[in-house]
Amino acid sequence: MKNMHYYIVTLAMLILAFPVKAASEAEFGKLSKAYTLHADGSQEMRVQKELTLFTHAAMNGLYGESFIIYNPAYQELKIHESYTRQKDGSIVKTPDNAFVEVLPSAAADAPAYNGLKEMVVVHTGLELGATIYLDYSVITRPGYLPELDICESVEELSPIKEYVLSLSVPDNKPLHYELLNGKMTPVVKTVAGMKT
């Protein structure tokens, strides 16, 4: 009886020592963010993502919409591609009425920021196992921002299989960067007059 008590206590301690990891709601197959400072002073932020949904919460709450904030007085938003690949392989293109322009909620009680816009991309054709594909750019006109100044978190709510963050500047400009709390070493190369 005493041995049985020790076995139960040992088993309970092992169960507590190894916490159960919850399954993720979704998974990014690829997430790519590219920031480019062009020679004329204009800037481009290009985001490409592939996101596979696993739960109803991911479809209906977490990832059913994508939000892109920009200032139309100085910036232009270009949606290069937006569609959903369903589990059976069929593709559902995002219709024109699924791109909804609204005032960002943070600017609601701030009249000075009422010129900002938030593009809500409502992803259509969602089902469990579907993959969302979104590729867009926010292009900033010359003179609005003098240099690239990026502070980007590498973490998302769901796991990421492939994450690419790139900064590109003309080769005559210095490229200053810092990677905090990471073990990766950035690769710097110069191609066609651009330092990346």
What spans do the regions from the language model cover?
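Bacterial N-terminal signal peptides
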Residues: I8-A17
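Bacterial Sec-dependent signal peptides at the C-terminal "C-region" and cleavage site
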Residues: N3, F18-E25
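Bacterial N-terminal signal peptides that target proteins for export
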Residues: M1-V9
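Beta-strand-rich, non-transmembrane domain signature
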Residues: A22-T196
